[in-house]
Each structure stands twice: as C-alpha cells, then as structure tokens.
Amino acid sequence: MATEFDSIATLIIRDLASGPTPPRVASGSGPNRLHTRVAEVVAAMGPPPWSRRIIADERQLVTLIASPPCGGNRPHWHREFDEWWVVLAGELEWELTGDVVVRARKDEIVWVPRGTVHHIRNVGQELSLRLAVAMPPAMHYFSACEQCGYTDDGPREWCA
C-alpha cells in the first residue's frame, strides 16, 4: 500500500543516484592523478626554476613550484581569488602590500587575500618547493612592489 512518504523516498533516492559526476582522473603524467609523489616530480623536472600543474579543474588549480636560492617571482595580485601555499621545502619570503613580510619554512602555510600585491622569493640556501592553490583561470595582474621597489617585468635574482 502506497503512503504519502513513498514519493519523498523516491525523490531522495533519485537525487542520490544522480549525484556529482565522478572525478576526471588522469592515468598518465598530467594533472589530476589520484596520487602524486612529489619526489618523482622533482626528479623528472630537473633543476629549478620550474612549475608543474598537479590539479586542474573548473574549481581549483594546484601547482608545485620550485625555486633555486635567490629565485623568485614577479610582484602581482589576483582580482578573483585568494591564493595560498604550503611550503614543502626550503625557506621563502612573501612581500605583501602594506609593508608586510611573511617568512615561511617547510610544513607552514601562507594565505594571501585577493587584491594584495605579493611576490615570493627563496631566502634559503637550498631548493624551495611550495604547492600553490588558486582558482581558475588564475589571472595574474603584474604590479610594482611597495617594499622592494621592483617594477621591471623581467626575471630577477633576489639576493643582491
């Protein structure tokens, strides 16, 4: 005998059955692998500087970035998203809008809110590795740095 709750139960079961699409998992060496060994990526990429996309989909971008001692990136900011990093090796320094400097080492996390000019440099004596987490399309808007006065658009060695 049917009850007033049968249609509700059917609706719930139907909703669960048509849930999210399973993840798109790459079987090769590209992004979106279920398991990535950082040491294998480092060995395959060779000497820094380099970056390798680890995860890329419509909601997130995760990039492994290696910098040599004194290496760094150009000052920039993001309009659409906050960015954060997990330091996996070395010692890095973030220079931020508002005369803020953050120094981070292995196993530390740095978060920078959208609209904040920032650049990162390796201040240690060894290779630095960090995972950068962003939101696609991860547009970068390049800008001068208040703290260091850096305005050139070219690469720079940060240990002068």
Indicate where each model-derived feature is located:
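Short strand-connecting beta-turns/loops that link adjacent beta-strands
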Residues: E58-Q60, E80, D99, Q125-E126
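Short, charged/polar surface micro-motifs in flexible loops or helix N-caps
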Residues: E58-Q60, P68-G72, E91-L92, P136-M139
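Short, conserved beta-strand element in jelly-roll/cupin
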Residues: A66-P68, W77-W94, V133-A134
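A short, N-terminal "cap"/entry segment at the start of jelly-roll beta-barrel domains
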Residues: M1-L64, R74-P75, C145-A160
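A short hydrophobic beta-strand segment most commonly corresponding to one strand
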Residues: I65, W111, E126-A144
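Short acidic-glycine-tyrosine-enriched beta hairpin
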Residues: G98-R114
